[in-house]
């Protein structure tokens, strides 16, 4: 069965050749007749477009381009683009397909996710290489720029992994981040729940690179600061040089900062984060323990079929899908471990 390269839903017979559904094209571009093929080749992107590229990746530099819609197709611009184009870096093949699938999952799970999809370079007939394209979230309804501030800047922390001392230890945890966000935006149950679920899904899906710059504040005109939508959310499970280096980009709990102490899960037979640690995290950011145990964690466990289905329908290569789902299933089982005895 063929699936839409935007929505990952089954295509109708008359849509199979293009690879896009009318619904998907309208979702991404407000035009169901839009031509999603890029007007330049991968080689042109590498050799001609570098002066327009900007950005960073899960490790170092990931070329990006700003895009606009022109004559029912995408075109590149130096600035003021409405979309960002992100091909897979050579050192991380199929990262575009990975980000698309993972962001689609986050969208289907109820997170705020900008419109996104996969597009192909021009002139590729036998083997299409996809690039990830996403709507810019720092634009208002009139496409005017809104001020965006990444969390390392907002917190005045110079290192995105929280290594601010001479000892190379991490002194910024997800708990500290969550409290800072809640202090400077809306501190209510829905926001607490959103942050709680965001961090848990980073763990479950193998997003071991969710650092400070992957959280941002948006400052709408004449309004309070808001937490930016999900962005740069990928699974690094298929890339062992990153995945095997750490369980999460930052410590989960404030008491782990500076390597002062270990979360409970590391003192059990499992030797990594378990459900008890996420219960502690949730309580520390203001959630009720009973709500976490009786509602939030069971809801996440019940979302298993949806997660597996979307990855299975994605354009990631099968070995990458298998790798991500192996991590997901293992960590989902660990999340279900509560009141686990310590060694």
Curated annotation (Swiss-Prot):
It comes from the Bacteria. Keywords: Kinase, Transferase. PANTHER family: KINASE HI_0665-RELATED (PTHR37419:SF6), SERINE/THREONINE-PROTEIN KINASE TOXIN HIPA (PTHR37419). It comes from Haemophilus influenzae (strain ATCC 51907 / DSM 11121 / KW20 / Rd). Signal peptide: none annotated. The keyword Membrane does not apply. The keyword Kinase applies. One of its GO terms (molecular function) is protein serine/threonine kinase activity. It is an enzyme of class 2 (transferase). Belongs to the HipA Ser/Thr kinase family. InterPro entries: HipA-like_C, HipA_Ser/Thr_kinase. The active site is at 209 (proton acceptor). This is Putative kinase HI_0665. GO terms for cellular component: cytosol. Its EC number is 2.-.-.-.
